[in-house]
């Protein structure tokens, strides 16, 4: 029924088409992120009917990012429920529970209509994305942004500069990332995975449609994104 496998660069167009249909706004709904960070949780993928399904693992238990590729209108919801029932059987055959992540508040409501009290919902604040009003970040008014105003003041007091990344900068960025990793906690698995993610981002930079920038202090790189 399902044939999960590691994500590949050749999956870009098909995955992006599914992501465009659903248009979810979490960082996990990015082909570039899915590809580059796949080693963080042993993520595997499958295409089932019109759905793009991403399955990761935590302490050996599978969890599925809320699938994309089908709209959540009335007919689409029926397809989702049908898929979830099949995934429930798939995980049950593994002796594991069925779990979804990145479920929107809207999806929770219609899932409750079907599953009732059998549906358990938990908020994972540590996984929330940060969302700011652009006008707030432009003005930085009030006590809430006092710290950010101080950061900007410190920035202006030093010989700081910013530049957009080009392929000519990738070697310097890679060396900076390696130095940062060497000074980090080697027991932090995510730090090691980050090195692989950076490698993938730079290897397929243009193909993934990425943009980046670097900060310099006194002519020396201080960070990049």
PLM region descriptions:
Residues 85, 105-112, 153-156, 178:
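A broadly conserved amphipathic alpha-helix scaffold signal in soluble, globular proteins
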Residues 1-49, 189-190:
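Amide-forming acyltransferase catalytic core, primarily the GNAT-like/NAT-type
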Residues 116-189:
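Acyltransferase donor/substrate-recognition loop-hinge adjacent to the catalytic core
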Residues 30-99, 106, 216-225:
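Conserved donor-binding loop and adjoining core beta-sheet/short helix segment
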Residues 96-114, 125-128:
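Short, glycine/charge-rich beta-strand/loop segments that flank catalytic centers
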Residues 168-221:
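Short, conserved active-site entrance elements at the starts or edges of catalytic domains
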């Amino acid at each position: 029924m399902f044939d999960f496998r590691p994500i590949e660069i050749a999956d870009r167009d098909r995955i992006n088409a599914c992501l465009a249909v659903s248009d979810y706004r979490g960082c996990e709904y990015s082909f570039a992120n899915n590809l580059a960070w796949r080693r963080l949780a042993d993520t595997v993928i499958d295409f089932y009917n019109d759905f793009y399904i991403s399955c990761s693992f935590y302490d050996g238990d599978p969890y599925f990012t809320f699938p994309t590729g089908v709209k959540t209108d009335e007919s689409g919801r029926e397809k989702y429920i049908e898929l979830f029932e099949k995934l429930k059987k798939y995980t049950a055959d593994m002796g594991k529970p069925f779990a979804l992540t990145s479920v929107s508040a809207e999806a929770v409501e219609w899932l409750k209509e079907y599953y009732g009290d059998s549906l358990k919902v938990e908020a994972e604040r540590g996984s929330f994305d940060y969302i700011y009003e652009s006008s707030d970040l432009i003005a930085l008014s009030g006590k809430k942004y006092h710290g950010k105003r101080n950061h900007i003041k410190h920035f202006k007091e030093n010989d700081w500069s910013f530049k957009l990344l080009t392929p000519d900068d990738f070697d310097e960025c890679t060396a900076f990332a390696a130095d940062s990793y060497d000074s980090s906690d080697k027991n932090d698995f995510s730090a090691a995975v980050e090195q692989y993610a950076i490698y993938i981002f730079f290897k397929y930079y243009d193909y993934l449609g990425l943009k980046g920038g670097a900060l310099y202090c006194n002519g020396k790189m201080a960070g990049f994104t």
